Amino acid sequence: MKFIVIKIGGSTLSDMHPSIINNIKHLRSNNIYPIIVHGGGPFINEALSNQQIEPHFVNGLRVTDKATMTITKHTLIADVNTALVAQFNQHQCSAIGLCGLDAQLFEIKRFDQQYGYVGVPTTLNIDSLSYLCTKFVPIINSIGFNNHDGEFYNINADTLAYFIAASLEAPIYVLSNIAGVLINDVVIPQLPLADINQYIEHGDIYGGMIPKVLDAKNAIENGCPKVIIASGNKPNIIEAIYNNDFVGTTILKSLV
């Protein structure tokens, strides 16, 4: 089976170009199995604001206490995931919404105590995911369940998407409101792994882009052939990436 992981950022979800679903339908008609992973940062922030809770980030990652976790879980599973599945189904693209708990899709562990209820994936149930791909487009939110302590955890959606791509040895398209990796305000078309650390050290890659590229580096070192970071608001962006039309930034082991 040939998979493509497509990570849709929270910013793109509110302004997702309708061609994304059509492009995904086209992939399936060509026996390519797309797997959607989504975040929901803006929606989580809005839900927290409604409860007078201020979001807090460390090194680009959301700090998640118990109250924040409860709101995050409800927002991602009941609101964002459900709405996205409905959107796909309305376009005659049969989709199924999933979190880590469903079909024991993936297992997690706590990331770091300072981040609270933030987890990282440790194993992926490839058999279950492969079977679901033959019937539906899986739409996976970034909520996981820890079988050891019986708690739900928030996972950085990029981290989860990269982990799935590495586990399946599949390419990943990371779609957000960012056109690619910017160096001196210019999108670079290709970023080899060897250049990532120096760009971070020099401050050219900073903020929320740091975990994105480090997770991409880790994914490629563990089996993912390439990572493409591109804008999800452009028409037919998935088709353009698939056809190697040089959109966004392609992160790869070395320059071709």
Swiss-Prot record:
GO terms for molecular function: acetylglutamate kinase activity; ATP binding. It comes from the Bacteria. InterPro entries: AceGlu_kinase-like_sf, AcgluKinase_fam, ArgB, Asp/Glu/Uridylate_kinase. Substrate binds at residues 40-41, 62, 154. It is found in: Cytoplasm. Keywords: Amino-acid biosynthesis, Arginine biosynthesis, ATP-binding, Cytoplasm, Kinase, Nucleotide-binding, Transferase. Its main location: cytoplasm. Its EC number is 2.7.2.8. The record marks 7, 212 as: Transition state stabilizer. It catalyses: N-acetyl-L-glutamate + ATP = N-acetyl-L-glutamyl 5-phosphate + ADP. One of its GO terms (cellular component) is cytoplasm. Gene3D superfamilies: Acetylglutamate kinase-like. The keyword Thylakoid does not apply. One of its GO terms (biological process) is arginine biosynthetic process via ornithine. Pathway: Amino-acid biosynthesis; L-arginine biosynthesis; N(2)-acetyl-L-ornithine from L-glutamate: step 2/4. Catalyzes the ATP-dependent phosphorylation of N-acetyl-L-glutamate. Belongs to the acetylglutamate kinase family. ArgB subfamily. This is Acetylglutamate kinase.
